[in-house]
Curated annotation (Swiss-Prot):
Residues bearing PTM N-acetylalanine: A2
Full protein name: Nucleoplasmin-3
Family named by the database record: Belongs to the nucleoplasmin family.
Annotated source species: Homo sapiens
Region (Disordered) location: 141-178
Lineage: Eukaryota, Metazoa, Chordata, Craniata, Vertebrata
Alphabetical list of Gene3D superfamilies matching this protein: Nucleoplasmin core domain (2.60.120.340)
Compartment(s) where it occurs, according to its Swiss-Prot or TrEMBL record: Nucleus; Nucleus, Nucleolus
Assembly and oligomerization: Interacts with NPM (via N-terminus). Forms a pentamer with NPM at a ratio 4:1 (NPM3/NPM). Two pentamers form a decamer.
Function text: Plays a role in the regulation of diverse cellular processes such as ribosome biogenesis, chromatin remodeling or protein chaperoning. Modulates the histone chaperone function and the RNA-binding activity of nucleolar phosphoprotein B23/NPM. Efficiently mediates chromatin remodeling when included in a pentamer containing NPM3 and NPM.
The keyword Chaperone is assigned to this record: yes
Post-translational modification: Phosphorylated.
Record GO terms (molecular function): chromatin binding; histone binding; RNA binding
Tissue specificity as recorded in UniProt: Ubiquitous.
Length: 178
């Protein structure tokens, strides 16, 4: 049993040495920055669609999190159907109705941070609106900028932590018990 424990400890020691950098021999993830901005647009009889786009060259991850759709001042008591045009998992464009708003029975709809990947187009399929769409534009960036000084410190830390673990030895039995 002691040999099995020693082998397990040696394996764990080897595993921690093979992982690069960081505290305890573990890889430290790149610093992540997350920014969040208000988003809003209005669809009406004059402006029947709106497209939310981001720059393709941007290395950041963009998410549009929708919070609410609501009829605003001047809306008639008619059905206002709003659809979202986006891409599915196969990168094919699909159109999905997300709201059917009517002033007398359902003037607003909470979407509880319904997340979409840009580009996204909102269309007023029926009705004259105005329909207000609100949410948050979230931008997540990972910084790969590591200074030379930080790299050297990580190498020194990993060298210090490469200490051989001594195997656990079984306790010696005492021969003469009364």
């Amino acid at each position: 049993m002691a040999a099995g424990t020693a082998a397990a400890l040696a394996f764990l020691s080897q595993e921690s040495r093979t992982r690069a950098g960081g505290v305890g021999g573990l890889r430290v993830p790149a610093p992540v920055t997350m920014d969040s901005f208000f988003f809003g647009c209005e669809l009406s009889g004059h402006t029947r669609s709106f497209t939310f786009k981001v720059e393709e060259e941007d290395d950041a991850e963009h998410v549009l999190a929708l919070t609410m759709l609501c009829l605003t001042e001047g809306a008639k008591d008619e059905c206002n159907v709003v659809e979202v045009v986006a891409r599915n998992h196969d990168h094919q464009e699909i159109a999905v109705p997300v709201a059917n708003l009517k002033l007398s029975c359902q003037p607003m709809l909470s979407l509880d941070d319904f997340q979409l990947q840009p580009p996204v187009t909102f269309r007023l399929k029926s009705g004259s609106g105005p329909v207000r769409i609100t949410g948050r534009h979230q931008i997540v960036t990972m910084s790969n900028d590591v200074s030379e000084e930080e790299s050297e410190e990580e190498e020194e830390d990993s060298d210090e932590e490469e200490v051989e673990l001594c195997p656990i030895l079984p306790a010696k039995k005492q021969g003469g018990r009364p």
